[in-house]
Amino acid sequence: GPLNIASYLMGTTEFLTLMMMEPDKAELLLRKITDYLKAWLTLQRETFPSIDGIFMLDDIIGFMGEDDFRTFGLPLFKELYDAPVSVRFLHNDAPCKVCAPILPEMGVNLFNMGFEVTLAELKELTQNKVTLVGNLPPRDVLAKADAAGVYAATTAMLDAMPDKSRLVVSCGGGMPPGVSTENVNAFIRAVREAK
């Protein structure tokens, strides 16, 4: 996403400082990035007409307060997600309590988050208007636990969810290296056996 790209270009601290100290310059940079992203996404859809979605990663959202996000981020994300596609996917595995209630307004309908916030809490924060993708701890459970631990953690995560609609069970964030086949199979078994 535009905030993440700006942080790659400048450095995270430098970009966040620029937003506070010289907001006009930050907005100019974000406008250039957003225009580029819109052109890039359009080119992809024109080149591959079967593409019916947008997938953006932007963890910088998690380091902003609501007012700053509404000022610097929300208008740009609304522009980017206002495309003629069915799937509007956002990955943000940084803290997401601030952005979660704003996801429907952004146009997001599929969200992959970190594991610090429970799925039940995220359902409430999004008013169950966004399909959630997550959120088993990837490193400490999926990669490091044994198969019994993965099964138990997955079962506990799902048992804590009275409403399992709008949910794609996955790990929070991304798949870590070193996950054993046994752990993947335990995860799948726990999901299949969930009540």
Regions found by a protein language model. Give the residues of each.
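Active-site loop segments of alpha/beta catalytic cores
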Residues: 1-195
